[in-house]
Amino acid sequence: MKPYFSFQWHITDECDQRCKHCYIFSDGKHSCLKSMTWEQMQDTFYNCFDFCEVFGRTPYFYLTGGDPILHPDFWRLLELFHDHDIKFTILGNPFHLNDQVCRELKWFGCERYQLSLDGLRETHDWFRKPGSYDCTLEKQILATPICEIKQNDLPAAS
């Protein structure tokens, strides 16, 4: 197998949270959230794919945003990955994960779904949004068998 070349790809500004560290919302001027069009996504995908072909690499994508699941063409993009046998990781938030979504992500080639935990409940919820801590723990446990995350101590932290 050819070595990987990784791309971190920001596909949308849309997000359910307003994290204090987030570059999208840090200046307070977020009235116009941006997302790539489907045409831009296809162009970007094929540019990355062609780059990897030229340099003998296997493309690997880290999808991020905002929350990539909120992009209107998110599932179309995953079909494109699947059609080209490209694996990926999602850097997202927990609010749109359920058993069915996790199974579909795995089927499309998702190897990991990164959820951030910024401390105990009070700190995490202050940093992200109220209720995020409990939702993150709940979804971390849901995603464990699908995405091979091993966090056995998480329930004890709540």
Report each predicted region and the residues it spans:
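Conserved alpha-helical substructure of the radical SAM core
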Residues: 1-112
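A short acidic, helix-capping loop that chelates divalent metal ions and anchors anionic groups
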Residues: 28-32, 121-128
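A cross-domain feature marking catalytic cores of carbohydrate-active enzymes
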Residues: 65, 90-94, 117-119, 153-157
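Short secondary-structure transition/capping segments
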Residues: 104-109, 138-144
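A short, terminal or domain-edge coil/loop segment
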Residues: 112-118, 148
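Charged helix-capping and loop-helix junction motifs
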Residues: 131-134
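Conserved strand-turn element in the central/C-terminal portion of the radical SAM core barrel
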Residues: 139-158
